[in-house]
Amino acid sequence: MGQGSGDDGVPPAPFSSAAAAAHSPPHSPLSVGVSSASSATSSSSTPPSSTSPAGVSASGARNVETDWKQSGDENLAELCIFHVPDKSVSLPNPKRAECTLPMNLILKSSSKNRKKSSIWSSDHIPRGVRFGPLVGEIRLVDVDTALVCPAEASMAGGGPAQEDVPFDEAPEEWKIYSPSGGRLNKTICVKDDARSNWMKYVAAAEEEDFQNLVAAQIGNDIYFYTVKKIEANTELSFWFSRDYARKLNYSTRPYVRVRRPATQLIPSAPPASASTAIASLAETIVAIDYSVKKLIESPIDTLSTDASSASDEEMIDVEEQESCTRPVAEVTRPNVIQNPVVRPVATKVNNFPGIPVRLGNFYASPLVDFKEFMRKSLQLKLVDTSMFVSPVAQTTAAITATGGRSGQPIDVQPVLAATAGAHFGNYAAIYGSQDFQHELSKPLYTSASPAFGGGGGMGGGFGMGGSAHTSSFHQLPFVNHSSSSHNDSSFNGVPNYVQQQENGKTRYACKDCNKTFGQLSNLKVHVRTHTGERPFKCEICTKEFTQLAHLQKHHLVHTGERPHRCDICDKRFSSTSNLKTHLRLHNGQKPYTCDVCDAKFTQYVHLRLHKRLHANERPYSCGTCGKKYISPSGLRTHWKTTTCKEEDMKDSMRDDLMDIKGEIDEGSMSGSGYGNLGIFENTLNSELKRPLMPIETIYSKYNLPNASLLGQGPSGMQEQQAPPPTSQQQQHMMYGNTMGHMGQGSHLQGPPPPPQHFQMDHSGMQNGGGIPHQHQLIQGGPSSGSGQQQHPQHNGIHRLPDLKNPLLPSLGLPHYP
């Protein structure tokens, strides 16, 4: 073996002339002669073991090829001298796989099976050429099959626990593993010709001499590498690389693919009755952890064989095994286990009608996988019977005596794990529901379908004589899932996320938007934003929430509890997020800046609404007249002042909220600095129910002097009573009202006090500055000499009041200096 063989280093250089001497056995139909010119060597490109002054022997060329076949995937990628891409094909094309064949390759009948096609070379192909990647239909795997045994663990304690290859010529599904081999990321299905490429036709090598390609996983793709020189008119055949074969638990050499070790046949025995056969097997069947459980379908009539005639080294083909009587597989001890733990195994036995069966000690103490039982009983979508019976219970109930109580097997006393009597925690406190506490008093199983037999409940099946047993196991908490809650698709066996590995840490990616999370629980909460699921419902106002914490926070609205207080103005809030947002009004913090006009805001939702002014974005439209508005309040005001029919805006408001949340999740905002998004959500949800607040109501609510603010116009004369605002003016007024509502939280107790150095400048207002111009835009223009109001005309993009005016905090509106 050369210097680069095995695991100790880098294989020889790809242009080694020794590799040009491809070796084929004499009986091979693909034998290629080795000329003297091709056997010339170069000492700089071949290992010492494969070079000689006169030339290269056949054994030296074989060593070089073996070095390449046993190289790691990373070494193969580094030694690639040329990459052959697929031929570009226009889509759609039902024969895409055949049309993607690159140059020097053709598709014709296979040498092993004339009915199937294979890939052949039409010209010389050197060693070190890479083909690929493999193209096919990407299929994600579920959670149960994603985690596999790593390659290192499968080889612990001895030789590798190799599996039989489940295909004859080429696989129809290729598996993509994580770098460690402990997790299956996805599979690539190549059944459909319209969605795959030519690599699906490459046949697997049956013997090592015919192998000229290795299939390696590089990243998340499959590539083929030539491991030796391929002459013209040679059929391409592959086997898996060293690293990829270990991930698949396959042999690294192809010649053991179609053979299995000999199995021991049961010697002939006189026929026995069904009850005797089952009873004898029940006393002897034991299993070891991680071993494959036996499945006995019927008493076996074996053939008389001479055990001594078969040697230990004999290999029995699959066809020979199928022609003989079906043998019982021998229980093998895995290499990982050194001190096995012997325990009884729940064996599936057919119930023979009319024959009373007594199992004796076979089911004396079956060990119930309590953790798995709890997971399925709480997560699976239950059927109309609202019942989940464990597989052990179903098997036990199927084998019963003819005389005895209904549904109760004879001599069956299941023994639970040591954690069966442990307390399961306060589920009522977690879910916060009285209905859940009511469910705690219900037994998990009824007498009509007991899990382990014995009367009503589960006490009778535990050797308690049917008496009431106060263990917490037989009164498991049972959650009655409604149709609108807990619709996690992972309960149906189809996961809604993809597990990934980033920098040695496990990340969970959402299938819908590809966002990644470090915690699986956070991802499950995020998925509810796509499904619209709100499993937590308030019992007072029937409002629904995506998280339990949001429901608990919402309960403070009904109780009126406000535990968080502002140290500056003594205003109280129901949550810390509302308090942090409020403190920005005192310290002047405005972390959100407009990219267009450099306006700054205390909350991100304010900036989001402000940006709609520049972009003329109007997501809320009237279905009757087609007019569009910036905020839901503007559309609601339009419906009040016109004859247009009012519509439901919940969907559009929810989409608007999801857009803002999505921008925050994408990283545009960091930490808790994006402001009180919960207040914005409550505002959107309650916008349709909240009545319109005129500007006069704001003055009376906060005891503001009406004459000092609106009584004096630019001319110094007393203004007449303004007429009711127009629909466009109400839109601006509602926008300011909405901004004030979000800025102060869902419970307005009054605006924060203005700074101590601030004093109201009445002269400025008399000279036409200050707030009168604000309310001229909202309430109406200044009075003319004739005493009639002149309302300004608004064309194009309607501008809002000057949000930088220092009087706005006194009106309950946000202030932006």
Curated annotation (Swiss-Prot):
Q: What are the alphabetically sorted keywords of the record?
A: Cytoplasm, Developmental protein, Metal-binding, Nucleus, Repeat, Transcription, Transcription regulation, Ubl conjugation, Zinc, Zinc-finger
Write one Gene Ontology MF term: DNA-binding transcription factor activity
Q: Which domain of life is it from?
A: Eukaryota
What Pfam families does its record include?
PRDM2_PR (PF21549), zf-C2H2 (PF00096)
Q: Which GO terms describe its biological process?
A: cell fate commitment; negative regulation of distal tip cell migration; negative regulation of transcription by RNA polymerase II; positive regulation of apoptotic process involved in development; positive regulation of nematode male tail tip morphogenesis; positive regulation of transcription by RNA polymerase II; regulation of nematode larval development, heterochronic; regulation of transcription by RNA polymerase II
The zinc fingers classed as C2H2-type run over 508-530, 536-558, 564-586, 592-614, 620-642
Q: In which tissues is it expressed?
A: Expressed in hypodermal, vulval, intestinal and distal tip cells.
* Location of the SET domain: 103-241
- PANTHER family, alphabetized: PR DOMAIN ZINC FINGER PROTEIN, PR DOMAIN ZINC FINGER PROTEIN 1
Q: What is this protein called?
A: B lymphocyte-induced maturation protein 1 homolog
Q: Which organism is it from?
A: Caenorhabditis elegans
